[in-house]
Design a protein with these regions (language model features):
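Positively charged
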Residues: 1-173
């Protein structure tokens, strides 16, 4: 099921998310809905707060054709190591459509999480995968990619998003 994605500014996007105690049937269904929503958008990552759920859950799939899809469901993800080398990617966000900016992050990160069967997982991500997982974990901590930008750029994007939300509310766009 495709779920509506919250748009910035929305106070729910700025909250610290609660840990998941167990991968219940409802939460696994939520994760699968999030994957459907992410692919439909289209995007490469989505965090539970972006669909209005204050839980530490993200989904992602950064594959590029012709490699096969690799959907990941991560409950309670945490970065346990990051490289000292950094890289810069132009990031966007499904909650801030049509806005992009360069963000510098560690080039590689090791992340621990529980999967949908509640098995412990750990993997080192590099490149776009590393950027994506860090971006999505930021959502769980109430942080958006625009929070890495200067105040003026962040305010400009926020004003544009407020205007876009008003237009959507009036039935436009």
């Amino acid at each position: 099921m495709i779920r509506p994605i919250l748009l910035h500014p929305d106070p729910r996007l700025k909250k610290l998310c609660d840990p998941v105690a167990q991968a219940t049937e409802d939460l696994v269904k939520l994760a699968r809905d999030m994957l459907d929503t992410m692919y439909d958008a289209p995007g490469i990552g989505l965090a539970a707060p972006q669909v209005g759920i204050n839980k530490r859950l993200i989904v992602m799939d950064c594959h590029k054709a012709p490699t096969p899809a690799r959907p990941l469901i991560l409950f309670n993800p945490e970065v346990v190591w990051h490289s000292s080398e950094h890289s810069t990617y132009e990031e966007g966000c499904l909650s801030i459509p049509d806005h992009y900016a360069d963000v510098e992050r560690p080039e590689a990160v090791t992340v621990r999480w529980r999967d949908e069967t509640w098995a412990k997982q750990e993997e080192t991500f590099t490149g776009l995968w590393a950027t994506c997982v860090q971006h999505e974990i930021d959502h769980l901590n109430g942080k958006l990619f625009i929070d890495y930008l200067g105040l003026m750029k962040r305010q400009m994007i926020t004003r544009k998003m407020e205007k876009a939300k008003r237009e959507i509310a009036r039935g436009g766009r």
